[in-house]
Amino acid sequence: TAVLWKTGKMWFRVPETVKIVLKNRLPEGVFAKDLALWIKGILSKLDVNGLAIEYHGEGVASLSIDDRMTIANISTEMGVVSSAFPPDDRLADYFNEPAVRGVWADEEAVYSRFIEIDLANVFPMVYDTGNNVLQGVEELVGLKIQQGLIGACASGRLEDLRLVSMILEGKHIANGFQLFVVPASRDIYLRAVEEGIIDKI
């Protein structure tokens, strides 16, 4: 702080960058949260604290902006300082701005690590926060669950709520089970109300 006061300047260390290349697309019934946990499982074996991540490859185009935000959100839990996706048509559509532009890595960019992920191999994942263990959903068949949370920062976007309403439509929550649904923002909540999603949930 004293240096900033004295010189009017501040120095920041440019983080090393991990390049993650995504191939193919996620199978039906597998979602961005599963991919985020899959990536978490890979990165947990590496020291990525203080590093940045860039996502490349044709698989990126299959991910919505909400998907990308979910993946970037969970990456911060491992100490990653930033996650970047290329500016593309999906981003332009999201902002309703055909001429949207962004900053992206040049061809000579140097990376500290290179990771390739075939999205077709990703399957539904569960993160056991108590034991810090990632598991496939199939490993937990038969496990009794008393509470569920859908929402907050990692899974409370409009896409998530639409999916939940589709799954729950015409169904009832089991006796003894509590389900909490928390939209990520007031704007998302209001849009969900307008679409009739909240009534279905």
Q: Model-found features: residue ranges?
A:
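Fe-S-dependent hydro-lyases/dehydratases of central metabolism
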Residues: 1-201
